[in-house]
Amino acid sequence: MKKELIVFIPSIEDGGVEKNLFEVSNYLSKNKINLEILTCNNNMSTNFSKEIKFIGTKNTFWQNKNRSIKYLACLIVLFFNLIKRKKKPLVFAFQANMYATIIAKVLNTKIITRSNSAPAGWSQNLIKSLIYKFCINLANEVMVNSTEFKKLFEKKFQVKVTCIYNP
């Protein structure tokens, strides 16, 4: 039986994260992982193997919306997609980690989160930081892309972090 994985990335743009997304997704697909990409940017499908299924909004209306709108749209799709499945897939969140984790945990689904930005820039607010700490500790696995981020996450959020360098 093939393993199932939903890659949650509401907004696919041009950058290093996306390059990693293409490489990792295509690698997993070649290695017999049933992979689905949940995004508002179906226009980026040409960068992926033909075996990879795109779920989410198909309408081009969403492609040029801001990240917050894309996050909301894809979180709604994630919620209903997980509800209708008998066998729950693993969710791998590239973006909107906190929100995707809440949905996954409410629906008894395993989730891996990936963070590639240092918490110092976005976690200055104490309440926001405490909420994030609570949510990130619900994830089954937390990944970062450098030993520096690993140390920062472990210290600030008291969470076990795996460091996987960019391919």
Give each language-model segment a name.
Residues 41, 93-97, 146-147:
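Helix N-cap/beta->alpha junction signal
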Residues 74, 92-99, 115-116:
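Short His-centered aromatic/hydrophobic patch
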Residues 90, 104-121:
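Active-site proximal beta-strand in glycosyltransferases
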